[in-house]
Amino acid sequence: VEFWDLGPELTRPARALKLWLTLQVLGSQAVGRVIDHGCVMAELAEQRLRSNPAWQIVCPAQLGILNFRYVADGTLPDSQLDQLNQSIAKEITDSGFAQVFTTELLGKRVLRLCIIHPETTEQDVLQTIHRLEQAQAIAPANR
């Protein structure tokens, strides 16, 4: 049992407590700035990925989250692209540099960036994109 997830009486979920405490400590303006920063960083990642035709934006950046997919030159079957994207996520996550996970959207395996840390910089985002590009070059399914 995670007592943090329960209210003072330890029987019901206290879902609002985390948000309430965050707003009390940081204030609504600071929370707004953090959310805006995440949105800007995700939009930067989207802009950078759109400049390379090997990447497909599956769902535009929203609230700091970007869903995209490596499509290479467009000739690989979806099953191979699904494996390739899974390998890319594993490669970059295993490196410890960034946490890039996969999900399924529109029946396809896609990569997901969730850029919500308030200290994430433009350089961090660009370096993550660079490492994604390196990972796709060495991913097993690409050989």
Regions found by a protein language model. Give the residues of each.
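Conserved PLP cofactor-binding pocket of PLP-dependent enzymes
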Residues: 65, 94-112
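PLP-dependent enzyme catalytic core of the Aspartate aminotransferase-like
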Residues: 105-143
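Short, hydrophobic beta-strand segments
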Residues: 21-22, 67-72, 111-116
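A generic structural motif
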Residues: 25-28, 72-74, 117-121
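Conserved PLP-binding catalytic core of the aspartate aminotransferase-like
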Residues: 57-92
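Flexible, glycine/charged-enriched surface loops at secondary-structure junctions
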Residues: 49-60, 102-103, 142-143
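C-terminal, well-structured subdomains that either form a transmembrane helix-short loop-helix hairpin
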Residues: 49, 62-67, 112-114, 125
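Active-site C-terminal subdomain of aminotransferase-like
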Residues: 1-53
